[in-house]
């Protein structure tokens, strides 16, 4: 059976891994998943990530905890294959009053909602992380 939405699968694996207090989660790798992981690491939501293997690369995300609680309280897919969500730079959402981020796919690559607003770019809203 083929996977219909690999990004939703990635976010679900991270959510389930943190709910089960796992140290790391593994999943099939893609360029978009690696870009999302890099953004989450830069924003401080995950500890680290690595791509392993040549023929079938796997993405391993090391999860981050603070005082035995997951750093990611909420991770939610917004734009999906059946319903794409696009916003202009002045209409980009602020997640939890600025405490969270919205991952936005712009013409300049993947970035947080704050960075996209600062650059004056809109795009597809991939997910919310808080």
UniProtKB/Swiss-Prot annotation:
It holds the Pfam family Ribosomal_S8. GO terms for molecular function: rRNA binding; structural constituent of ribosome. Keywords: Ribonucleoprotein, Ribosomal protein, RNA-binding, rRNA-binding. GO terms for biological process: translation. GO terms for cellular component: ribonucleoprotein complex; ribosome. The keyword Ubl conjugation does not apply. The keyword RNA-binding applies. It comes from the Bacteria. Gene3D superfamilies: 3.30.1370.30, 3.30.1490.10. Part of the 30S ribosomal subunit. Contacts proteins S5 and S12. Belongs to the universal ribosomal protein uS8 family. This is Small ribosomal subunit protein uS8.
